[in-house]
């Protein structure tokens, strides 16, 4: 982790790309998707829901729990627990085999989960509530969301797009547009990938 290559950015550079398009000389770090455990725990952390208690019994229904994903109960014989299906959807290795490196897949079911699952809807609601507690107006809330999720401030274009989206909502419920906006941000590649 202390090597110069490991600490490199994933930022694209035209000159370097023209010389080494496949990045064999490691002129930048290749973006990599977070594993399902880190991603789920990050979602709970940014929504201020993560239960950081150490130890205790494993959890059979991890999508209904606020415990760290480390405590998910998994089965070595198949789909015995709800956690098995959720974790496998995002490339958790099979418990029946030794796996030296996890595969990384991008399949439609993952995106359907991000758009439609009760788990993601609840995280979006919790993020919306947190942003309304911690910031006074939409501009401040957008800035806070970007700092929580991406560890940076939004660009002017991102800020304007967010304000436009939130002001264009026809919903009478104050939090609903924020839930939708938060769900989009939490489902973004920038949140799911280490850059």
Task: Annotate each PLM feature.
Residues 181:
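Globin-like tetrapyrrole-binding proteins
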Residues 26-27, 167, 176:
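Compositionally biased amphipathic helical and low-complexity segments enriched in hydrophobic
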Residues 145, 161-162, 177:
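Amphipathic alpha-helical segments in structured regions that serve as interaction surfaces
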Residues 160-169:
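Amphipathic alpha-helical segments that form the core helices of the histone-fold
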Residues 5-7, 11-149, 153, 185-195:
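An acidic, gly/pro-interrupted, aromatic-rich
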Residues 1-2:
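Short, functionally critical alpha-helical segments immediately adjacent to catalytic or ligand/cofactor-binding
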Residues 137-138, 171-177:
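Short, charged, surface-exposed loops that flank catalytic or proteolytic processing sites
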């Amino acid at each position: 982790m202390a090597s110069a290559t490991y600490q490199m950015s994933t930022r694209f550079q035209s000159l370097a790309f023209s010389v080494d398009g496949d990045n064999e000389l490691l002129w930048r770090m290749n973006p990599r998707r977070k594993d399902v455990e880190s991603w789920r725990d990050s979602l709970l952390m940014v929504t201020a829901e993560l239960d950081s208690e150490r130890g205790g019994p494993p959890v059979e229904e991890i999508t209904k729990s606020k415990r760290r994903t480390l405590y998910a109960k998994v089965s070595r014989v198949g789909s015995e627990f709800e956690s098995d299906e959720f974790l496998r959807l995002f490339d958790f290795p099979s418990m029946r085999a030794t796996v030296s490196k996890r595969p990384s897949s991008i399949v439609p079911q993952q995106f359907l989960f991000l758009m439609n699952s009760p788990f993601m809807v609840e995280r979006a609601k919790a993020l919306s509530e947190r942003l309304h507690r911690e910031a006074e107006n939409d501009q401040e809330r957008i800035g806070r969301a970007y700092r929580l999720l991406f560890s940076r401030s939004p660009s002017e274009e991102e800020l304007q797009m967010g304000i436009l989206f939130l002001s264009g909502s026809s919903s009478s419920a104050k939090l609903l547009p924020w839930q939708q906006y938060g769900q989009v941000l939490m489902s973004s590649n920038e949140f799911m990938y280490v850059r």
